[in-house]
């Protein structure tokens, strides 16, 4: 009783087609499809550089930089 059958949906689709016209609906569908495609391409592009931006981890410490940081801290005191 409360659900919509296939006939209800067909009538709604017919009314929408009459109001907007098939050309306008086709343009809306094309725009929506290209927007979804652009979004997916953007998501793929944003995932790839994230892996490339990771810095390689080395087990060594730059002693000169460590000493420079200590000397600047002692100059502040």
UniProtKB/Swiss-Prot annotation:
GO MF annotation list: protein transmembrane transporter activity
Protein name as annotated: Sec-independent protein translocase protein TatA
Gene: tatA
UniProt function note: Part of the twin-arginine translocation (Tat) system that transports large folded proteins containing a characteristic twin-arginine motif in their signal peptide across membranes. TatA could form the protein-conducting channel of the Tat system.
Organism of this sequence: Burkholderia mallei (strain ATCC 23344)
GO biological process: protein transport by the Tat complex
Keywords: Cell inner membrane, Cell membrane, Membrane, Protein transport, Translocation, Transmembrane, Transmembrane helix, Transport
HAMAP family (alphabetical): TatA_E
Origin organism lineage: Bacteria, Pseudomonadati, Pseudomonadota, Betaproteobacteria, Burkholderiales
Region (Disordered), start-end ranges: 43-77
Main subcellular location of this protein, as a coarse class: membrane
Cellular component GO terms, alphabetical: TAT protein transport complex
């Amino acid at each position: 009783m409360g659900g919509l059958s296939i006939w209800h949906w067909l009538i709604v689709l017919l009314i929408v087609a009459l109001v907007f016209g098939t050309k306008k609906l086709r343009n809306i569908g094309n725009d929506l499809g290209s927007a979804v495609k652009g979004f997916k391409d953007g998501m793929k592009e944003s995932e790839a550089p994230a892996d490339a931006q990771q810095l390689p981890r080395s087990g060594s410490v730059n002693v000169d930089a460590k000493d420079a940081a200590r000397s600047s801290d002692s100059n502040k005191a």
